[in-house]
Amino acid sequence: MEVLMAERADLVFHNKVIDATAMKRLISRLIDHFGMAYTSHILDQVKTLGFQQATATSISLGIDDLLTIPSKGWLVQDAEQQSLILEKHHHYGNVHAVEKLRQSIEIWYATSEYLRQEMHPNFRMTDPSNPVHIMSFSGARGNASQVHQLVGMRGLMSDPQGQMIDLPIQSNLREGLSLTEYIISCYGARKGVVDTAVRTSDAGYLTRRLVEVVQHIVVRRTDCGTIRGISVSPRNGMTEKILIQTLIGRVLADDIYMGLRCIATRNQDIGIGLVNRFITFRAQSIYIRTPFICRSTSWICRLCYGRSPTHGDLVELGEAVGIIAGQSIGEPGTQLTLRTFHTGGVFTGGTAEHVRAPSNGKIKFNECLVHPTRTRHGHPAFLCYIDLYVTIESQDIIHNVNIPPKSFLLVQNDQYVESEQVIAEIRAGTSTFNFKERVRKHIYSDSEGEMHWSTDVYHAPEYRYGNVHLLPKTSHLWILSGGPCRSSIVPFSLHKDQDQMNVHSLSVERRYISDLSVTNDRVRHKLFSSDPSGKKKERILDYSGPDRIVSNGHWNFLYPAILHENSDLLAKRRRNRFIIPFQYDQEREKELMPRSGISIEIPINGILRRDTILAYFDDPRYRRSSSGITKYGTIEVDSIVKKEDLIEYRGAKEFRPKYQMKVDRFFFIPEEVHILPGSSPIMVRNNSIIGVDTRIALNTRSRVGGLVRVERKKKKIELKIFSGDIHFPGETDKISRHSGILIPPGTGKKNSKESKKWKNWIYVQRITPTKKKYFVSVRPVVTYEIADGINLGTLFPQDLLQERDNVQLRVVNYILYGNGKPIRGIYHTSIQLVRTCLVLNWDQDRNGSIEEVHASFVEVGTNDLIRDFIRIDLVKSPISYIGKRDDTTGSGLIPDNESDRTNINTFYSKTRIQSLTQHQGTIRTFLNRNKECQSFLILSSSDCSRIGPFNGSKSHKVTKESIKEDPMIPIRNSLGPLGTVPKIANFYSSYYLITHNQILLNKYLLLDNLKQTFQVLKYYLMDENGRIYNPNLHSNIIFNPFDLNWCFLRHDYCEETSTIISLGQFICENVCISKYGPHIKSGQVLIVHVDSLVIRSAKPHLATPGATVHGHYGEILSEGDTLVTFIYEKSRSGDITQGLPKVEQVLEVRSIDSISMNLEKRIEGWNEHITRILGIPWGFLIGAELTIAQSRISLVNKIQKVYRSQGVQIHNRHIEIIVRQITSKVLVSEDGMSNVFSPGELIGLLRAERTGRALEEGICYRAILLGITRASLNTQSFISEASFQETARVLAKAALRGRIDWLKGLKENVVLGGMIPVGTGFKGLVHRSRQHNNIPLEIKKKNLFEGEMRDILFHHRELLSSCIPKNFHDTSEQSFTGFNDS
């Protein structure tokens, strides 16, 4: 007090404008200087003055006082312009939906924020005495956000879930809202208005529960004698402000020395002077007392509580600090909930900071330290991992700019930047406390069409048969327009008169694979190719001018390589690999190969794992042409999908089982199915019976007779016709109500009048047209027996299969459809019921370490005869040949930009490559960006023979000779269209387009002699990596004429454009392909004429890494199917509507987020470790102590974090008192139990300690976290519990147990009408506390114990460091730092 008296002379003199916060500071300083009474007198005068002035000024608020900010018009216009550009990019396929949403939110958020910052200076300049300005900025009424909505713009709103609506409200409330804007703003504000009532009641209930937990805590003693403390240290990154907040008003638990000099003693309370001294002396760690370490659970002592926040002195005896604490935490809740109401659901988000260039100049940085990436808006950028120094050289000075780690660099090296240009973007710090959540966003296709993607897409290996694909890097998905050929009559046709059209398709789960050969029948040569159906098939080549030929390879193999005839590949036996020959021509008849061709499945990366299906073929015996249902009858089926194959990919389980057969019989029940559009009229009724060739719909007739079932689904009608007989059963017949039963041949109907035996299997199904009547349809069944599989010897040479150390094959039969699955046949196609698969296997013992084998596809040409081989290597390293730059092999044509890289090729050995050097050939290198290896596509002079055996064709030989004469022509000729990846300079970066290749073979090989161009369109697809692969068969797709765009080019097209356009290439919108300017629609080049192109329109969708692609390559998607699922993190709006439930979750100890582990789990782990190390009595005690300390600190941090993020300051000690009550119980466990407590009983920790010491026998217990509700129901007083919840239950239990209520708390006394033991009523306890003076001895004993305890905790670090992540001491320090990271 002497100090205060001395300072009374120095009166505080203020001469400045005071707002609300300054007023608070002033009042607290006044209290410090003059005490309570004097201050209240001063404040009274201020109040009177204020009212006088307000009356004199008489501020009124009219609508004219709301002045809109002048710069608003062009700011909004600018933002709209940016949104428009963004929309365009999304349309072109440069950014995807999530990036677009994210960027548009940030554009509008930034605009809105900018307007908000303009508001204050604008008012200050134009109209400083504006009532809105005065009220808002003095803190009297209305905050910046509300005024901003009145005079700025409302901006982005959030919907009731706290998600963003990406349509901003551009007008403010002064200008008035349009109808749309009004609806959007009401949509989000409902949360604010309606929920306010609910939320207020929530906050009230929270307060009630909090007070319930701590109402009995009263200051009852000056010092409890504890010698523990929690250390706070200024070292670890605490700001001074936070340190001061933490320390002021606490009491020291230990003396503090500076060297040998003691600067503060134990039990001294910390004032601002002392804190400053600590900061100047840089005291290492300061032990303070907190409610956590007070010795009793039912009261608290003055020193552990510290100063009372009201009058800056140690708290008085008899103060009800518990209730104060409950109210301090609950009350801001009510304020905070109201806050949503004030801003009406306006969204707040975070924007990133920018680094701008200090002056004009050239920018330079070290490119090794950065890594190219996409920003979250889809712009290309560099990511720097460590601090990056960027130099900007202008004419005379060099500026250095430091860019912090994890930032995005938005410029390229050596680029010229202008002053104030944004060169880097710093990630928005995590200091903004926004709750992140992971969101799935599905992108749906907006048109019908065929899906195409780059080879980048890979399966998760577990999903060989599923449709979950992951994208490892950014690429496009294209939806090529055109619908599948359905069973309706095609109203238009693309084919010219007399074209030959050959459509054959087979259906494998909605993939309509078919082949389309379209030509004019003038000049024809036949080509043979193996087809899935195994029929020899004509491919027709056309010499007669620029007409369209679509001819396809069939396999998805890597890099078909053409080797010269000297190569030694034909040897069939090699160790560790085997080679399967395919016959292209008549030789097939000589070998006993079954009619149905073998289809080989090799993944695109060429790597096969054990038990992968290598090849399959479809036995024609198990092919049906009509729809129907498969049933297994008595078969045991072993579904191949085992438990471990099913991996949950981000929550979605998807796989497609194939069923492996154990027994050799299954049944097929045919039915006819028609799928009609929803609008079409149907000529027959449901459950009616029709004959063959009845007219069902306008142009559809039934092929079989029978019972009709009509089912209406979304947008279409499914009409089924069941063939077979119909029986009306008598009353005695019991027919199962199930979907249907199979009856074996030879069984008749018992007890019925007509006894009829069936010769074959039948399927009986009960049909109920009305409730009472029903009849039975008996349908014929086709029975299939399954053979034991084909003899492998007929497929492959015998010696191949007998090798021991080789790759082996097993034959497995799969049924393709599940039991009872309906099978739909598409128009005129056949359905394969059983597929025979060859499964790879190899010897585990010998090659135990080998997980995967590499397959390659090799094509060998010998004198017009072409053989294809698959080679499967068990060899570990795929790299078998390295060619250096000066090597003779490399002296072919390697493009300049890639010539200095080492060419590593995966499929050739050295000897084999050498044979190529005798003939001059072109080597075209494709850089494979994923792996650091390159692959060759070699066009040697034997290239032309690849076209196939042209029987006696002259032009063929001419071509070969002319190539030999002038080796440069084929190079020039084929390098143009073959494998060029045009870089399209797009709006702000270059995207690689997906290209297809054509090989142009000119008859006389002269460019200007265009009339006689001989075109073979070999249909390749090239992906964004420059890898080439064959697509699968061309689908049976009918184009709509409107989907094709004709694009006319100049006649000089061949010289200029042939490098840009190749057949099958995908062209994004807005790309220049001719002199006339950009192309209008995006699409795929379908037909190339000399002077024009036909482009099939396609829609690109961009997808980034980590996205999931649904569906299969080449699958036909209908409108509205899901294409891609993006998973992205977004911050929920930082509304306290999310904040209050968070506080409540922490206090009720529910698990909050999946990321931070639930504290309870952590607690259990700790308990086990420590008990194991220290043995029983100490182990339980210390285990419980440490766990409790840990969880207490982290709970306090979590609660503070939520409140701080809302700008609400609550003193830590209030939260501590409450947390102490939640964590002060332990749960008695069973083992080693003495008879004192029953297992599962909750007792206080201190009580457990004392009982354990008294009994000198360990009680086993573990720490437990109670929520506030449970804590309220587990107090010492049953009257208080009964008045809280579940009155009857609590009272009945108390009566049964014979509980005694000592009436220590406030509530019990209030209920019974006694005097409450706080404040003046506290005197009743004074004589008790006097008795404590004569117990120094007991305290000393306790101190002995406490000393040992403290030793164990703080000094024996070696002992604990093995089981405690950080020792106790540090954890508390660090977590106190954590308290204050708001």
Swiss-Prot record:
SUPFAM superfamilies: beta and beta-prime subunits of DNA dependent RNA-polymerase. One of its GO terms (molecular function) is DNA binding. GO terms for biological process: DNA-templated transcription. Zn(2+) binds at residues 224, 294, 301, 304. It is an enzyme of class 2 (transferase). This is DNA-directed RNA polymerase subunit beta''. Its EC number is 2.7.7.6. It catalyses: RNA(n) + a ribonucleoside 5'-triphosphate = RNA(n+1) + diphosphate. Binds 1 Zn(2+) ion per subunit. One of its GO terms (cellular component) is DNA-directed RNA polymerase complex. Keywords: Chloroplast, DNA-directed RNA polymerase, Metal-binding, Nucleotidyltransferase, Plastid, Transcription, Transferase, Zinc. InterPro entries: DNA-dir_RpoC2_beta_pp (IPR012756), RNA_pol_beta''_euk (IPR050254), RNA_pol_Rpb1_3_sf (IPR042102), RNA_pol_Rpb1_4 (IPR007083), RNA_pol_Rpb1_5 (IPR007081), Rpb1_funnel_sf (IPR038120). Belongs to the RNA polymerase beta' chain family. RpoC2 subfamily. DNA-dependent RNA polymerase catalyzes the transcription of DNA into RNA using the four ribonucleoside triphosphates as substrates. In plastids the minimal PEP RNA polymerase catalytic core is composed of four subunits: alpha, beta, beta', and beta''. When a (nuclear-encoded) sigma factor is associated with the core the holoenzyme is formed, which can initiate transcription. It comes from Liriodendron tulipifera. The gene is rpoC2. Its cofactor is Zn(2+). Its main location: plastid. It is found in: Plastid, Chloroplast.
